[in-house]
Amino acid sequence: MFESKINPLWQSFILAVQEEVKPALGCTEPISLALAAAAAAAELDGTVERIDAWVSPNLMKNGMGVTVPGTGMVGLPIAAALGALGGDAKAGLEVLKDASAKAVADAKAMLAAGHVAVMLQEPCNDILFSRAKVYSGDSWACVTIVGDHTNIVRIETDKGVVFTQADNAQEEEKTSPLGVLSHTSLEEILAFVNAVPFDAIRFILDAARLNGALSQEGLRGSWGLHIGSTLVKQCDRGLLAKDLSTAILIRTSAASDARMGGATLPAMSNSGSGNQGITATVPVMVVAEHVGADDECLARALMLSHLSAIYIHHQLPRLSALCAATTAAMGAAAGMAWLIDGRYDTIAMAISSMIGDVSGMICDGASNSCAMKVSISASAAWKAVLMALDDTAVTGNEGIVAHNVEQSISNLCSLACRSMQQTDKQIIEIMASKAH
């Protein structure tokens, strides 16, 4: 139907968004280990009795302090146990969506019995690595995930190797829809958003549905640090204005509260992260409601936000010391600016100001406090948009911001790729010392 109207570049953009914007139940690093455990358990006939798991330092960092949905418990061991005992290996990032109350109870009992061990993989050259080895009687199965949260590269049992990705890995890399992001630009992304048929991108409205539901849940319950509901109370006390800026702050942080606090609702993720998906979605939704945008305008704004966030994050490691809520919020800035103004220059100025503002915020692991980073990133995005609407932005004479937005993005990402690697090691060392 509309495929005939879409040129190959635009089709690649759509495929990239479909690849990177997916539903995810629970923080994606523990969920990656849960998926490995579920896939391993699926290879066994008997009941899983014991689990040994190994993860990369970055995955350990992002799994130590976050609540696993439906369990009320924090950390990687409960994720591995519930994945093995109640997970659906075919559900990807929603591996735990159908876990029963009995599976949760059995997983907790397995932990209490000391039958789950999660260790650092040493040495480990992969930023994202999870391996689960599950045992049932004399049988065992082991599944390894590398590079991406759901990318299973090896399945092995006591009877031999069942699957290995090594043979077709190079071919898969060539056909990845994300390859187009290495040689495109924000201008091309904006041209796509302005002209692509609505029906081709209607699917992105699911992000508003899922992340909007998370936001509502965050305001209903006392999830995580309950930042969103706390700020509502302060509005009622007269300590915060009830305006658009506050609405962006409250509704975005509420979604992250629910996400990190263990609510059993999926987030629409971006680049493998629920919080990045929330940050790229909710601020745009709030502004769209404020300006009275219809579904088509909302879809175009969300597509610009999510694709811009993916485009920027594609220049980063999958996990790093840089808090990627900041880069997702750069996408949100683009989407919000488009809704109000629509011009490329306004969008570029907003992103440049974001880079001059929140760049360098560290990622010290997934936890309830992510909602604070999400909220400050969303607020910074709106501030940058307001500045751009007044033809004001951080200029190329200041800090790491360059005279064009593409170079500014490159400068920011080079920090995470090179200079912040030592920062990441120090963060992991500090967090590991607290665990002993």
From Swiss-Prot:
Record-linked InterPro entries: Ser_deHydtase-like_asu (IPR005130), UPF0597 (IPR021144)
Tree of life domain: Bacteria
Gene Ontology BP term (one): L-cysteine catabolic process to pyruvate
GO function term, MF aspect, one: L-cysteine desulfhydrase activity
HAMAP family according to UniProt: UPF0597 (MF_01845)
Family membership noted in the UniProt record: Belongs to the UPF0597 family.
Name of the protein this chain belongs to: UPF0597 protein YhaM
Lineage: Bacteria, Pseudomonadati, Pseudomonadota, Gammaproteobacteria, Enterobacterales
